[in-house]
A protein has these predicted regions:
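Catalytic alpha/beta core of large soluble enzyme barrels
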Residues: 46-48, 52, 56-168
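Residue patterns forming the tRNA-binding/recognition surfaces of aminoacyl-tRNA synthetases
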Residues: 1-45, 104, 130-131, 135-215
């Protein structure tokens, strides 16, 4: 499989409001979750890693509802919604993104795990790259090397598994729970499944440029 290139989809971009998602990736061997943000929930079944900015500050926080989360310090108030003092979370520890590198995360979907195993490549851990910004989201992005240039670049840098769970027509493949469903139609289905598993933190509406036709 090859990643879709930027210029291949550059025609026909327009701004549309759609659901983005802040999802909870369970940390391996710890009762805590890494909060990651995505504007393309349909890519989550193809996820193989999480990426942080090595130079930014990240925190482990405990929230009022008893959850422990990792995310960028600068985005805590925005994501955790502490409008009025006292903020509904406490900072337990601070880290640089680099220090979080290597932290293991549990996969959401079994379909990608089998593919990774066949490729004999390590996935499901935190990697670092300066392309991650703190302008939106949580300061943590999920990586699916089959989709998007940045993901592909990070995938090559860390020799991550390549999981392509979308066919040439833009439909989800048979390995996923959404076989034959067009990617954008799969978004709400993915979010619903994650919500039922308790892994969806939030699904705000988000406006961004998106290619409006597939090939």
């Amino acid at each position: 499989g090859t990643p879709l290139s930027g210029h291949e989809v550059a025609q026909g971009y327009k701004d549309i409001k759609e659901r983005s998602a802040v999802v909870r990736f369970k940390v391996k061997d710890e009762d805590a979750y890494i909060l990651a943000w995505t504007t393309t929930p349909w890519t989550l079944p193809s996820n193989v890693a999480l990426c942080v900015n090595p130079d930014e500050t990240y925190v482990k926080v405990k929230t009022a509802d008893g959850y422990t989360y990792y995310l960028a310090e600068a985005l805590c108030d925005k994501i955790l919604g502490g409008d009025k003092p006292p903020a509904p979370y406490e900072v337990v520890e601070r880290y640089t993104g680099k220090e979080l590198g290597g932290t293991g995360a549990e996969p959401f979907f079994d379909c990608a795990v089998d593919i990774c195993a066949k490729q004999h490549k390590k996935g499901y851990y935190v990697v670092c790259d300066t392309y991650v910004t703190l302008t939106d989201g949580t300061g943590v992005v999920h990586i699916a090397p089959a989709f998007g240039e940045d993901d592909a670049k990070v995938g090559r840098k860390y020799d991550l598994p390549f999981v392509q769970l979308v066919d040439g027509k833009g439909n989800m493949t048979a390995e996923t729970p959404y076989a034959g469903v067009f990617v954008k139609k799969a978004d709400p289905m993915v979010l619903k499944d994650l919500d039922e598993k308790g892994l969806l933190f939030d699904a705000p509406k988000f406006e961004h440029s998106y290619p409006t036709c597939w090939r």
